[in-house]
Amino acid sequence: MNGYFESNPQPWEYFPRPPKKKQDQLLRVFWIIALGLFAFEIFFNENTSLLSKAGAILITTASLIPSYLWCSGRAHGMPIFPFFALTFLWTYALPLVSNHPTVMTYSPSSHLFAGMTVAGFLGLGTLVWFRFVKSIPPMPKFYRSLNIRKGINFFLFILITSVLFNVYSNAGWLESINGGTIAVVRGTILGLTALGVFVLSYQLGKKELSKLQARLFILFLIANLVTSTVTLLLVSASSIALLAIISFVISRKKLPIISIIILLVILNFLHYGKSEMRSKYWFAKNSSCYVQPWNYPAWYSEWIGYSLTYINRNKSEDNLPSNSEEKASFVERSSVIQMLLLAQDKSPESISYLYGATYAILPELLVPRILNSNKIRSHEGTSILNVHYKLQTYEQSVKTTIGWGLLAESYANFGLIGCGGLAIILGTAYGKATRWSMNAPILSFQSLFAVLMMSYSFQSEFSAGVYVAALFQSSTTIAGISLVLMKKQRVSRHAFQGEQMN
């Protein structure tokens, strides 16, 4: 396998395209999901206004077009933008037809205008992105890449390191270390963990891991999910699991249906008891949120107990408050369209646009903390938004952040012009990253950077400051790996010619 990697790199782009059978299977799954979404939005929401349904359908259509282009083989390379667009299904489209308590406070005409805004944003972004991915670029003369055996071992080491970091952090054993240092270490480990999960899941889908490597990867992945969920924050585990599924789908060209169902059932079940756990360990006086590793069984047993209690109570009580934190659904918690609705309702008449205030801080966020001990928080832009729209005081925003997402932030800064500018920027960035990673092996600098872009593309609540700071820090780490561990290798044209002939 090592020799094959040295002379015959595994490209992201396939020559020819994936076998027609697999392509057809992928398209069938796409159409089943698409028709299911449209049916839900049109027929299963009797209490929803026609204008709200129209807004949801517009967003859904625009969200699915990039995925159709990729599934049908018209778009090449890594599907960064398609997966980014899909996040708008649960963050923007479904909340319009799911009786979201905050979204319902706005008029149906506001829903339609928001839907048109999102659809226009995604449509323009798709046009820009498609320009870069509709054709295959010439092969590079060389690339920098990890040796495949060393690369797999390196990322297995990263995963176990991530598990140990979670354990130490959950137990409070890192409290003596400077907060700024911990933030840098955490960001680095999170970025490398995302890369490791994607690379190893991709290799698992290609059946290029040995039995031992495959078992270790699955074991470390489960351990990572367990230790990250101990914090009572499900978003981290959900993101890692989603990244693993995406990578597997890209390489195997099949949906792991059973794994997805098991994951959704577990996360949904834990969600039921999360509120009680947070109330007891986050907000109660004299309580501690630190959990020692030997207490994990008791911790999860208690959590499971609260979830079962909620389910049993829900069966016997039909009138539970639908807007309570405990009752909040996945769609309600993941939604950010209410922030766009707020910005469109208030600006520019009642509250002025920010005119780039949340973007002006970006250069400062790129300065390493070691060079600026008073460096501002990456969430500073989010605080500016929440204070400006009177959602929080600055002190409150430091303790708890209300996420806006890139699109709502762009509207709050410049209105529709800001949304259009963001579409062009993201379409270009994701398109260029995708094109750059075509014809590059999975462990090359180009592909790892594209994986990094994908891992951040579905962080739907990130403001520009958080997004740029996290991407810059992780990119710096990849650059360091490239300089220290990667070697310059020439591309073997015979490998690609061989792929074309198969």
Name each model feature, range by range.
Residues 34-41, 85-96, 159-168, 219-229, ...:
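Aromatic-anchored segments of alpha-helical transmembrane domains
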Residues 21-31, 74-87, 147-157, 208-217, ...:
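Membrane-interfacial loop-to-transmembrane alpha-helix junctions, especially the N-terminal start
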Residues 35-39, 62-65, 195-200, 216-225, ...:
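Hydrophobic, membrane-inserted alpha-helices
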Residues 127-285, 491-497:
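Membrane-embedded catalytic interface detector for glycan/lipid assembly enzymes
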Residues 348-414:
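Long extracytoplasmic/lumenal interhelical loops at the membrane interface
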Residues 262-377:
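Aromatic-rich transmembrane-lumenal/periplasmic boundary elements in polytopic membrane proteins
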Residues 1-142, 244-249, 253-269, 470-481, ...:
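N-terminal "leader" segments that precede or initiate the main folded domain
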Residues 390, 396-502:
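Hydrophobic alpha-helical segments
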